[in-house]
Amino acid sequence: MSTHDPISDLITRIRNAQMRAKSKVSTPGSKMRANVLEVLKNEGYIRGYASVDHASGRSELEIELKYFDGEPVIREIERVSKPGRRVYASVKNLPRVNNGLGISVLSTPKGIMADHEARDANVGGEVLFTVF
């Protein structure tokens, strides 16, 4: 099955799995999804992820979700930039999520990174989604 928006698909799979208190969820593999998951892992929102190759040649990403006292670590995850309405931000205009308690994930010329990394690298880009 093809999706027109792989980032929204990834976010929805994570959100749905956490609502059902699943420990793992899988998603079709791609470099962009792996880079997004690397940012979420580095920021402490997921335990980790692994790439699983199938005999048919397709790969999947197996995501280990993270919980604290039985509650999901990710309270809220929202798509900002969509295929029909792209949202770009310069370094000066990067959004702060809940006064810095959450993060924005951006696609920049230097790769996919969290908002604080983009400020340090002095780059702006497309605001993919926010996590709190």
From Swiss-Prot:
Q: GO molecular-function annotation terms?
A: rRNA binding; structural constituent of ribosome
Q: What NCBIfam families does the record point to?
A: PRK00136.1
The protein here is known as Small ribosomal subunit protein uS8
Alphabetical list of Gene3D superfamilies matching this protein: 3.30.1370.30, 3.30.1490.10
Q: Which PROSITE patterns match?
A: RIBOSOMAL_S8 (PS00053)
Its biological purpose is as follows: One of the primary rRNA binding proteins, it binds directly to 16S rRNA central domain where it helps coordinate assembly of the platform of the 30S subunit.
State the family it belongs to: Belongs to the universal ribosomal protein uS8 family.
Might you name a Gene Ontology BP term for this protein? translation
Cytoplasm is among the record's keywords: no
Among HAMAP family, the record links this protein to: Ribosomal_uS8_B (MF_01302_B)
- Any single Gene Ontology cellular-component annotation: ribosome
Which keywords does this chain's UniProt record carry? Answer: Ribonucleoprotein, Ribosomal protein, RNA-binding, rRNA-binding
- Report if keyword Methyltransferase is assigned: no
Assembly behavior: Part of the 30S ribosomal subunit. Contacts proteins S5 and S12.
- Taxonomic lineage per UniProt? Bacteria, Pseudomonadati, Pseudomonadota, Alphaproteobacteria, Hyphomicrobiales
Organism field: Rhodopseudomonas palustris (strain BisB18)
